[in-house]
């Protein structure tokens, strides 16, 4: 595990329908993340937060697209710099649209080393594009974008994007996926472990299979963790909550086994909304899950 970490916050909520998730990075930091990571022996560099444009162009099918593109371009540059210095980029959102920038940067950096795989833990598929979306919210498009099936503007920053191979992509904990979106995911060939399959197989089996798929002939894995994957009773502070999600223990098992694989190259933690939270319960959980993904074990 890389012992040098760059923590990059992104104060972004223009990709979502509800405001407040822009304060997610502050909530996760307030939960003690930086000191706890230092206590684990990491060399932690807090790179501050990326700020979005306050105004920008929009459309019915890609709401606030100018702000989304601008933020992702800035994040792409920051993650690229982090990787060039040999550090682990840890990105704190912010809504999930920011994953387009972080994943694009990591994929580009490892393009000549086999590329990367992606494990996407989320209640939603995020596999829409401007033609399939029902809402126009761009936090529902980044997974498809980084694989070349979504809006190219989310990942094209003046050079050819390094798209992720769908054979190395896994979606876990989905339980609110649009019919068109589900059809597109099936056609693309992405591996999906919906919540009912986790119930049937158990999280250890699911995450081990996900690691095998994402790391097959790749340099390693990017983890994109949307806190709405966790059941709202445990993580109430998120804007698109869906009931009957992952338990806290299932969530920790997933990230602990990923840490033990020594395949993790980079990570996003997104969609923590402190406005909707209860005494920073969700921010604290997000911080603890990050620590477990980086090697801490919850007994």
Say what each PLM segment does.
Residues 1, 110-113, 136, 158-165, ...:
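Solvent-exposed alpha-helices and their adjacent loops that cap or buttress functional pockets
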Residues 2-12, 18-90, 102, 108-113, ...:
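Catalytic cores of soluble, metal-dependent hydrolases
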Residues 12, 95-96, 123, 174-175, ...:
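Active-site metal-binding loops of divalent metal-dependent hydrolases
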Residues 88-157, 261:
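Active-site histidine-anchored catalytic micro-motif
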Residues 120-123, 147, 168, 173-176, ...:
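Short, structured patches in soluble enzyme cores that scaffold and shape functional sites
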Residues 123, 127, 139-142, 165, ...:
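Internal, well-ordered alpha-helical segments in soluble enzyme and binding-protein domains
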Residues 128, 177-179, 274-276:
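Active-site environment of divalent metal-dependent phosphoester hydrolases
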Residues 155-182:
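Phosphate/diphosphate-binding glycine-rich loops and adjacent basic-rich segments that engage nucleotide
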